[in-house]
A protein has these predicted regions:
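C-terminal accessory/binding modules appended to enzymatic or scaffolding proteins
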Residues: 182-201
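Catalytic adenosine-cofactor/nucleotide-binding cores of aminoacyl-tRNA synthetases and other
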Residues: 14, 24-181
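Structured secondary-structure scaffolds
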Residues: 1-25
Length: 201
């Protein structure tokens, strides 16, 4: 069947013997079986579909970068020396089943956000804009051509106050939206000089 490895949660151990018998009966070559600890919630409960942000699309919707999520999941129950950040090539090079711990890992949203913040702050503005543009087109409103350059020029400081692409989108509304709402306190801070700067922008 050209299957070399079956890697799954340790709750499937009980199925393994029966499945091995099927392979042997069919005279197929047995794959390597690996049963790894389950991922739990921060409360120590088994992760389920009913939990908030349990699918990849859930994380995409809140602006989690795929590389950041991959890096976080890679380090969830696995380690390589004291290294924390892995690009895709390094992930493939260093990952091995022997490095996986025996205890269940906890899916911690605060750590996911921290990892995502690291990626946002360290990615170059061109790639970050492409990610933001894709995110906005998929989940928000598309960045129009006349706003694109202003967004690009602003990313160097927008990314320093962001943990997600959602944060960047929200903090760049003064560029993306044609209408900016000010409350009474905001208006008190806007003098003639401020109005001139805003209008020129």
């Amino acid at each position: 069947m050209n299957i070399t490895h079956i890697i799954r949660g340790d709750d499937h151990k009980i199925n393994t013997f029966k499945q091995m018998q099927i392979y042997l009966a069919m005279k197929w070559e047995l794959p390597s079986f690996a049963h790894i600890p389950l991922i739990h919630t921060v409360d120590g409960k088994k992760l389920s579909k009913r939990d908030k942000a349990s699918t990849l699309d859930d994380y995409s919707k809140i602006g989690i970068i795929s590389d950041a999520l991959r890096n976080y999941l890679l380090r969830l129950g696995w380690s390589f020396k004291d290294k924390e950040i892995f690009n895709l090539d390094e992930s493939i090079k260093y990952f091995n089943l022997e490095g996986i711990g025996k205890s269940p890992s906890k899916l911690d949203m605060s750590r996911i956000l921290s990892m995502n913040e690291h990626y946002i702050k360290n990615i170059d503005e061109i790639n970050l804009y492409n990610l933001l543009n894709e995110y906005c087109a998929g989940y928000k409103i598309e960045i129009t051509a006349d706003k694109a350059q202003k967004i690009k020029n602003s990313l160097s400081f927008l990314k320093n106050k962001a943990k997600t692409l959602e944060d960047i989108y929200r903090n760049s509304q003064y560029i993306i939206s044609d209408k900016v709402n000010f409350n009474d306190d905001d208006l008190k801070l806007i003098d003639k000089t401020s109005k001139k700067i805003i209008s020129e922008f």
